[in-house]
Amino acid sequence: MNSKNDLNDKFISFLDQTKNEEHKEVTRLNDRVLIIDGLNTFIRGFAVNPAMNDDGLHIGGLIGFLRSVRYTCDILKPSRCIIVFDGKGGSPKRRKIYPEYKANRKVKSKLNRNVDWGTAPQDEQESMKQQMGRLIDYLEQLPLTLISIDNVEADDVMAYISQQVLTESDIFLMSTDKDFLQLVDDRVKVWSPTKKKLYTKDAIQ
């Protein structure tokens, strides 16, 4: 699995490409961009998906994530998919990349598990760590962009990309975090994977 520095370098490369490349192929690639809140999607799958492997180990986070992304891509048919994960140290060291978005944010509530797998908290944390590691390995084999920046949370990066980088693209933000609704405009829409609903500018007015 690549290190955080590798993912940071990939993000810098991504910014350089989207800002400097003007080829028609790149333009088409950025026509309809799906940007996914990675940890939000993983935690949701981990909490509610009871899938087990042949050894009886819980793999709901991994399976739930992949199924959710596949379903969303089938529905929205993006030309490009970007998955953003919280960077190491993101929570205690919040960086205000897009101040207008951060100004009116509410504190996020902790996700409650809907199913008890009968595991101790430390075992649950280890399971999450192992599933996340395997998930990243799988995602790196797919034609999508993975982004994680140390000391920066995923929602900051998603807001920055949608408002400051891909300014000519139709953007679909995938998350259950209602704070993203602040970003909805003529270009930016929010897809709720739990409600299977697309929030447009007209829908939230």
PLM regions: where:
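Noncatalytic, basic helical substrate-engagement surface that gates or grips nucleic-acid strands
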Residues: 2-20, 24-174, 180-198
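A short, charged helix-loop
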Residues: 197-205
